Amino acid sequence: MAINLQKPDITELKPRITVFGVGGGGGNAVNNMITAGLQGVDFVVANTDAQALTMTKAERIIQMGVAVTEGLGAGSQPEVGRAAAEECIDEIIDHLQGTHMCFVTAGMGGGTGTGAAPIVAQAARNKGILTVGVVTKPFHFEGGRRMRIADQGISDLQKSVDTLIVIPNQNLFRIANDKTTFADAFAMADQVLYSGVACITDLMVKEGLINLDFADVRSVMREMGRAMMGTGEASGEGRAMAAAEAAIANPLLDETSMKGAQGLLISITGGRDLTLFEVDEAATRIREEVDPDANIILGATFDEELEGLIRVSVVATGIDRTAAEVAGRSADFRPVAPKPIVRPSAAVPAQPQPTVSLQPVPQPQPVQQPLQQQNVDHIALAIREAEMERELDIAARAQVAAPAPQPQPHLQEEAFRPQSKLFAGVAPTEAAPVMRPAQPAPRPVEMQAPVQPQMQAQPVQQEPTQVVRQQAEPVRMPKVEDFPPVVKAEMDYRTQPAPAHQEERGPMGLLNRITSSLGLREREATNVSSDMTAAAPSAASQQRRPLSPEASLYAPRRGQLDDHGRAAPQMRSHEDDQLEIPAFLRRQSS
């Protein structure tokens, strides 16, 4: 019986770091890092330009936007680069499988790097991968439009990465001279990315007295915002201090400073001659630049190739975190503070004004409020006036017995003052038709009442006495004694002479009738003259009274009197005489 013994497969557990180059600038950075011999890192290049992919040194490439760009590039349009990345998002995720840390590098200002880099970074971050962005900004001679596109791309990328490092190409002039070639200048910019990645990989892979694991690196770089990377080398006396100063003052970074950094990763590498005092001197100098409460992680490793040299690498994160939090709080506080102050102040003065004007008149409030709100709507105003006329008719009748007159009720009584005179000589049945034509008169008064309630209150208070005097006249009805003296004389004449005249008619002869008729004429003439003399003073006093046109129209008619107050029965008595005297006797008398 054979026994098969096999060696168990041991899965090597180590952090996997991927450098993802996007666009032309990212592909060039990857080529420079591969040429420098960076070990322990996987390289992936993605681009929309098929020709650029043929010149890359990376083994894993992604042709983005085959259907969108057909391999011709994005044409400096970030929208095209974004669409190309979204088209092959599944392939991007496959290349990120099993990655623990991803460096997304690109050149901002173009089409593919500016548009596709945020998509790649967001895909990596969604998988829980620690994502670090390292991008470059264009030169000033490339134009303002390209710079604005780059700034917008950096703003979008910062939302998708944990830590972002920005390297302006314009800063290359600080370290370049007239002999520096164009390719060498870009290689210097790529050295920043190379030193940062090498710093992290050396701490986790190479042998050393103070080794670091990937969890330490993740705690320093997770969601830290803007960051800076720097590396310095020195030899001879004071090499530790010189290397630390060179690492702190990196001339290629985007005007950043380590002041106030929340996370700090320090890597000190040297040969076997590295001393304890040199490590302390370098670490102390770097620690002075950051926040006292910053999370500082220090690692020291040995490299046989660095005999007589010391290399100090620094990764400072959370540089703008404190400033951003303070600015965000202040920005949130400023717009919110004035809002609750402005709204109550604008609403407080508007509320007491309508309440004060409406409190003294509780009943007409529903009538006044629609007039103020519907001044422009003439149709609604006419409807409201018709409703007011109906209410005024009811209010005029109900306010006769009201104990305490108010400003608005007085306005209604004043409007009906010319109508109150008509009740002196007109029956109650005639009051209704008289009030209807007089109602349009108070319309302008009612329209002005809600606009200026205070100005109308003064004349209204002077009217109550006049209204009471005018309403007292209808109580006294006309009697017989109020008739003119001419009418009284006529009434007396009808009562007294009638029986005497009837007594003489029966047995009277023809001659007596003639004489009696002549005497009757003389008596009537004397009576009329006496009545005229008696009625003269009374008629004069009657004419002195100011009679209104309404009273003259509705005064009792004098159907039996003429314009001079003479009695109409004279004509009747004369006619009676003409009827009583025969025709032949009338001829004889003539």
UniProtKB/Swiss-Prot annotation:
Molecular function via GO: GTP binding; GTPase activity
Gene3D superfamilies, per database record: Tubulin/FtsZ, C-terminal domain, Tubulin/FtsZ, GTPase domain
Annotated binding of GTP, by residue: 24-28, 111-113, 142, 146, 190
Bilayer-spanning residue ranges: none
GO biological-process terms attached to the record: division septum assembly; FtsZ-dependent cytokinesis; protein polymerization
InterPro entries recorded: Cell_div_FtsZ, Cell_div_FtsZ_C, Cell_div_FtsZ_CS, FtsZ/CetZ, FtsZ_C, Tub_FtsZ_C, Tubulin/FtsZ-like_C, Tubulin/FtsZ_2-layer-sand-dom
Sorted UniProt keywords: Cell cycle, Cell division, Cytoplasm, GTP-binding, Nucleotide-binding, Septation
Region (Disordered): 346-372, 524-590
Comp. bias (Basic and acidic residues): 559-576
One Gene Ontology term, aspect cellular component: cell division site
UniProt-listed SMART domains: Tubulin, Tubulin_C
Cellular compartment(s): Cytoplasm
Biased composition (Low complexity): 534-546
Assembly: Homodimer. Polymerizes to form a dynamic ring structure in a strictly GTP-dependent manner. Interacts directly with several other division proteins.
Family annotation (PANTHER family): CELL DIVISION PROTEIN FTSZ-RELATED, MITOCHONDRIAL DIVISION PROTEIN FSZA
Family: Belongs to the FtsZ family.
The protein's role, per its UniProt record: Essential cell division protein that forms a contractile ring structure (Z ring) at the future cell division site. The regulation of the ring assembly controls the timing and the location of cell division. One of the functions of the FtsZ ring is to recruit other cell division proteins to the septum to produce a new cell wall between the dividing cells. Binds GTP and shows GTPase activity.
Name listed for the protein in its UniProt record: Cell division protein FtsZ 1
